[in-house]
Design a protein with these regions (language model features):
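Short, acidic, small-residue-rich periplasmic hinge/interaction motif at the N-terminus
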Residues: 29-33, 38-45, 74-78, 88, ...
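Extracytoplasmic beta-strand/coil segments of soluble accessory domains associated
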Residues: 61, 127, 144-183, 187
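Short acidic/polar hinge/loop motifs at secondary-structure boundaries
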Residues: 61-63, 183-210, 229-231
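Surface-exposed extracellular loop regions of Gram-negative outer-membrane beta-barrel proteins
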Residues: 291-330, 356-363, 404, 409-419, ...
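Flexible loop and strand-edge segments within Gram-negative outer membrane beta-barrel domains
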Residues: 313-328, 332-397, 407-427, 530-539, ...
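Membrane-embedded beta-barrel scaffold of Gram-negative outer-membrane proteins
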Residues: 402-406, 410-414, 638, 644-648, ...
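Structural signature of Gram-negative outer-membrane beta-barrels, strongest in the C-terminal barrel
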Residues: 550-566, 570-710
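Gram-negative outer-membrane beta-barrel transporters
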Residues: 708-711, 730-859
Length: 881
């Protein structure tokens, strides 16, 4: 039997060699650019599919049976080329093939859904694709301006949200992962995105997945991912330069106008654009300017690219400025003499220097473009990263290996763009007469003593009403014109300067506190020395390995592991935080009958911070384990030509960032306070969708309809209030606040993150994307979408029952109302993007409409009548900017 087996094998091999002595070889090129196509497939059918793929130079060589055969040249994103060929015995034929890029929108190539290239029509989840041309037509100053035009995608205070998955995150803890070429761009410390880090000058394509994607991309992909793919060099050198300038329009209401022609001459802007001192020197309103320069080319076996970006924005809101300098590039070496195998390695590098300011509470209803003294914040940041990589592909056995690494360093510090108002300015705004202000400025503080007596009497007696009556009785004549904004200035000033010690002596026996005069002198004429800069430093070390195997039957697996170590040196906390994240993932994909695509995957992750070794702890069959597993599955079935139905289910999670859980941070007067008791967010997303391509006359595009359901457990939200600066606990009693003040202890205004037990978000998204071709030079591009969401707070009834018993003003409620909806989310949104292109001229418009915000933080409530009928007011009775 053994001899028979060997004989049979030898006969098969001999027969194979005799029948396949004929050779076809050549190159495969892009028909438009003449670039070689790497990895293009050349196949024919004979006892199953037979074939090869092209190498790094686009070369292919295939053995064929004698006689006639139909060859198919295929490449993802390109139209197939069918080539019938007749070849004689032992003949060698050379043929070059030119392939055209597919113009069908559903044939677009994406990689984010499965970490490998596939057609958009085959993915099992909702995905939007934005090409470089779409971005260029909108001329954005950063990529977030383009993303906010997509249906189902919102950018709230710079943080992305998919289908209501996030509200207002206060600058930390994004629930959507943002990637550049598969590498995270989220700040390792805060979990937030700084859009200035994205190399807009070199973006090739943006892929947006709406729904949990933690199996392949880990924590922060709870709500979805945004993968920004950069352009790669080709044989033809390419240089791109763009320059732009803009002028902000006047405020709709004249009293909102905060700038004038002399503003820049008096150095009242935090930044100064180049054109401000020349061409635009006479412009009253704020301006912005910028330019991009990029170059890429192939030199021998090297791919080289580089880019630079400068941008300066005075901001349409006072102190809402932005100034950035970004420089980066990449170097890739393609190993020659590898035959059909592919080996390349290199690195990407990027440096960013950034200064920007922002605020989230306006000064007053009539000064909506000016910051409240509580949120007077700016940031100075410098970061650098280098990402080495190595890729190996063996088409002969259908395997690939990819290794990516990163070293990241950042240094940043919070600054106040402007000094707080002085006490003399505050008194002047509040209507205090000139003589009193002059006396105070000259060192005569006697007019303030009655006020301190009134305040102190109430504080010492522990009676809030007495304290407030003391204030208004004693200061009624001093502050005749005081507004709420003026009192905010006064409170902010008091928080910065504190109160004198031994205040009870002034109340009880009329004796002045020993430090009263020095204290008043200091606050009236404060030292102008700049405060010591407290620079936080962040180090990140990252390593990712991925293995992929494909079989001829249409099956493939993707598996790998990641490791990340973060070191954060906090200047404010005077402490070093270290975290480790280790994960392994596996995904199986199968194509059946050339119609059905099935995908399933699993990931497990371990996470620790300092000595907290069980940050990812979970229960499996009742047993606690220090790691967290998550699963996903999906399918896509082609019903007919250009008709696809899909269904997916995915679990997700997000570990609280170091900033959310461990750090104390001042942000322009308002603080972020740590909470060691918050747990990771967990959740899942389920979706059923239908995609239909169409070509009606000159219209070509597709319609997509998706129903979705998302559930979160331990969802992290923040809550405003007063906090003890010593132990970071929330102050829930006026009596406790008074006692702290009388004891000389300070408290602060701020936010703290905590878990909301359960949230449910469900709804429907309907969109269409396409182009109308008038002729070869004239086109109309369009993208329209409507999203309905129902963002439910599943525990609102239990919370209302507890909050209904609150009697103290400092017992801060969760939301602005007792309804069932989550904060900072609308129910309805509609977006439309239309671009008309004639040759190289583009004219377009973006339109967005949203229904009212359903709830906000309780602290933002203001029951007073609205000051202006045209004032943007998200919910009736709420003054929030």
């Amino acid at each position: 039997m053994k001899k028979l087996y060997i004989l049979t094998l030898l006969i098969c091999l001999t027969s194979f060699g005799a029948s396949f002595a004929q050779t076809l070889k050549g190159h495969i090129y892009d028909a438009k650019t003449n670039e070689p196509l790497v990895g293009a497939a050349v196949t024919y059918k004979l006892h199953g599919n037979q074939g090869v793929v092209s190498n790094i130079n686009g070369e292919y060589e295939i053995k064929l049976p004698e006689g006639g055969v139909d060859l198919v040249f295929s490449y993802v994103g390109y139209d197939d080329v069918l080539m019938p060929i007749v070849i004689g015995k032992r003949e060698v034929v050379t043929k070059d093939v030119y392939m055209k890029e597919s113009t069908k929108l559903l044939e677009e190539v994406v990689v984010s859904a499965g970490r490998f290239e596939q057609k958009l029509s085959d993915v099992t989840v909702s995905m939007d694709v934005v090409k470089s041309g779409d971005i260029a037509r909108q001329a954005p100053t950063d990529i977030s301006s383009t993303l906010r035009t997509l249906p189902g995608v919102d950018i709230v205070d710079k943080q992305p949200s998919m289908r209501g998955g996030s509200g207002w995150t206060y600058g930390v803890g994004a629930r959507s992962q943002i990637l550049v070429d598969g590498m995270s761009t989220l700040n390792p410390k805060t979990g937030e995105i700084n859009w200035n880090t994205v190399p807009l000058e070199n973006v090739e394509q943006v892929e947006v997945i709406k729904g949990a994607s933690s199996v392949l991309y880990g924590s922060s992909a709870l709500n979805g991912i945004i993968n920004i793919r950069t352009a790669r060099p080709g044989l033809t050198p390419k240089t791109r330069f763009s320059a732009y300038v803009g002028v902000y329009g006047d405020a709709e209401n004249d009293e909102y106008q905060w700038s004038d022609k002399s503003f820049w001459k008096d150095d009242k802007y935090a930044v100064k654009p180049i054109l401000r001192g020349s061409l635009l020197s006479g412009v009253r309103n704020p301006i912005y300017e910028g330019f991009d320069l990029s170059h890429s080319r192939r030199i021998g076996n090297f791919d080289v690219s580089g880019g630079i970006n400068l941008f300066t924005d005075e901001g349409y809101r006072q102190q809402g400025y932005n100034k950035r300098f970004r420089m980066g590039g990449s170097l890739t070496y393609h190993q020659p003499d590898m035959g059909m195998k592919i080996l390349n390695y290199g690195f990407n590098v990027d440096f960013l220097s950034n200064q920007y300011g922002d605020f989230f509470i306006w000064r007053s209803p009539t000064e909506v473009y000016k910051p409240s003294p509580f949120t007077n914040m700016g940031r100075e940041e410098n970061n650098f990263h280098i990402d080495p990589f190595i890729n190996y592909v063996n088409p002969e056995n259908g395997t690939s290996h990819k290794i990516k690494g990163r070293f990241y360093y950042s240094a940043d510090n919070i600054v106040r763009p402007t000094d707080g108002a002085s006490i003399t300015d505050i008194l002047g705004n509040m209507g205090t007469d000139a003589q009193t202000i002059q006396n105070i400025a000259g060192g005569d503080y006697s007019s303030l003593y009655p006020a301190l007596v009134g305040i102190g009497s109430g504080l010492i007696n522990g009676n809030l009403d007495d304290a407030m009556n003391g204030i208004f009785t004693s200061l009624g004549n001093i502050f005749p014109n005081a507004t709420t904004a003026d009192y905010c200035d006064l409170i902010s000033w008091a928080m910065d300067n504190g109160l004198p010690s031994d205040l009870d002596k002034l109340v009880q026996d009329g004796k002045l506190p020993s430090d009263l005069v020095p204290w008043l002198s200091n606050v009236i004429n404060p030292s102008r020395n700049n405060p010591k800069t407290q620079t936080d430093k962040n180090f990140d070390y990252y390593l990712d390995y991925q293995f992929n195997k494909k079989w001829d039957c249409g099956a493939q697996i993707t598996t790998g592991a990641t490791f990340e170590h973060i070191r954060y040196d906090s200047a404010i906390m005077d402490e070093v935080y270290k975290s480790d994240n280790i994960a392994a993932f596996f995904q199986y994909d199968q194509r059946f009958w050339d119609r059905l695509s099935v995908s399933a995957g699993v990931r497990t992750e371990y996470y620790r911070v300092n000595n907290h070794h069980r940050e990812a702890e979970t229960k499996i069959f009742g047993t606690k384990v220090p790691f967290r597993p998550v699963f996903r599955a999906g399918l896509n079935y082609q019903l007919a030509d250009y008709s696809f139905i899909r269904a997916s289910f995915g679990q997700g999670y997000r570990n609280p960032s170091i900033n959310e859980k461990y750090l104390r941070k001042d942000i322009g007067g308002v603080g972020v306070y740590p909470n060691l008791n918050i747990n990771p967010e967990k959740g899942f997303n389920a979706e059923l969708g239908f995609k239909q391509g169409y070509k009606i006359g000159n219209f070509q595009g597709f319609v997509d309809v998706a129903g979705f359901y998302t559930q979160y457990k331990d969802m992290v939200e923040f809550q405003f209030g007063l906090f003890n600066n010593a132990n970071y606990t929330m102050i829930n009693s006026i009596g406790d606040a008074i006692q702290m003040l009388s004891d000389g202890k300070g408290f602060g205004i701020g936010a703290q993150f905590h878990n909301v037990s359960k949230a449910q978000i469900y709804g429907v998204e309907i969109s269409t994307n396409g182009v109308y071709n008038f002729n070869k030079n004239t086109k109309l591009f369009y993208n329209l979408g409507y999203v309905y969401t129902e963002p439910r707070d599943a525990d609102y009834q239990e919370r209302n029952a507890v909050e209904g018993l609150y009697t103290d003003p400092l017992q801060m409620k969760e939301k602005s109302n007792t309804g069932k909806y989550l904060k900072y989310r609308p129910k309805h949104s509609f977006k439309a993007t239309v671009d008309f292109q004639w040759k190289r001229i583009n004219v377009g418009a973006n339109v967005a409409w949203k229904s009212k915000i359903l709830a906000v933080d309780y602290l933002m409530m203001d029951e007073r009548p609205k000051m202006q009928n045209d004032l943007m007011d998200y919910v009736r009775g709420i003054l929030f900017g």
